[in-house]
Regions:
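An aromatic- and glycine-enriched ligand-binding surface/loop that stacks and positions planar moieties
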Residues: 1-135
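Active-site beta-strand/loop architecture of penicillin-binding DD-peptidases
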Residues: 129-168
Length: 169
């Protein structure tokens, strides 16, 4: 039923070519995000809030500790597993290219846009984030602000935000 409903939406907008080309990368584009502050109201946005260009509270609350964040929002394994492979097959499907020994390779590109997982890069310097239990401050349960699931939220956070208290820019 969900697939049928999604197909109806795609048909309604004129097929795949009618979908916005920036849908996957919208949150990566600071200019588009900053335009929201100035009254931009793109049709792709169905839920929004306003944020000033220099406001980094969301990043401070949700970045991993190594990026000077509090790591408050931790996606679950169930959410990560809901992202299909790059061809759209569920990771449990026999046709899937999912590989348990390399679980983040060949996945729907939204996974890397929405979730910080072990080995993903994040932050203004594209720091590699290690979330394993024997990893540094970003590892599972290593600090009070460390992930409790092995993942950190990435969607809606600006990777250009610098939360380092000694940052002067």
């Amino acid at each position: 039923q969900a697939a049928d409903a999604a197909a109806e939406v795609v048909d309604y907008v004129g097929g795949p070519s009618g979908l916005p080309s920036t849908g996957l990368t919208y949150y990566d584009n600071d200019a588009e995000m900053n335009a929201l502050q100035n009254g931009s109201n793109p049709p792709e946005i169905i839920w929004r809030s306003t944020k000033k260009a220099d406001e980094i509270d969301d990043e401070k609350n949700n970045f991993p500790p190594s990026l000077y964040g509090s790591g408050r929002t931790n996606p679950t394994q169930n959410l990560v597993d809901a992202f299909p492979d790059a061809k759209g097959y569920p990771i449990t499907d026999a046709r899937s290219e999912y590989d348990e020994s390399n679980p983040y390779a060949n996945r729907d590109p939204r996974l890397a846009k929405y979730i910080i997982y072990n080995g993903a890069t994040a932050g203004v310097d594209n720091k590699v984030i290690k979330t394993g239990s024997s990893s540094g401050d970003d590892g599972i349960g290593r600090r009070e602000a460390s992930t409790r699931t092995g993942y950190y939220m990435k969607k809606m956070l600006r990777m250009t935000a610098n939360c380092n208290p000694s940052n002067t820019s």
